[in-house]
Amino acid sequence: LSDPFFDTNILIDWLSGKPQAIAELSRYRRHRISRIVWTEILAGEPMETRRNVVQLLAPFEMFELDERIAAAAADIYSRDNMKLLDAYILATAQVNGAILITRNTKDFPAEMPGIRIPYSL
């Protein structure tokens, strides 16, 4: 597998300075996210701090949605009964041959292939 993708909750923890998230990100040379994750993070930020958060996320390699990711997300949505935005996030990792790092075990079961749950809070 190639360098992983990070889910929204891991990045929120990282932005909040949680040591577990800082340690997890430090394990990897490249940090990749879906445009959906970027959007979810900005949506949770007050307007006054969004510019700063965009700068903090700038080093992350951003993956835009395309037809392959959309088709894979539709399959995941139907097969696994997953929320559509979560299906897009997982599909972005899978289409790019990577795992998804998350601590969201409610939407991404730990036993699901391609999921890494590094810690819980």
Map each language-model feature to its residues.
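A general structural signal for well-ordered alpha-helical segments in protein cores
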Residues: 34, 38, 50-53, 70, ...
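Alpha-helix capping/helix-boundary segments
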Residues: 10-11, 37, 69, 88-89, ...
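Short active-site oxyanion
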Residues: 28-30, 58-61, 94-99
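Acidic catalytic patch
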Residues: 58-79
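Acidic, PIN/NYN-like endoribonuclease modules and their adjacent C-terminal/linker elements
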Residues: 18, 90-121
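Short, well-structured N-terminal submotif of metal-dependent ribonuclease cores
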Residues: 1-33, 42-58
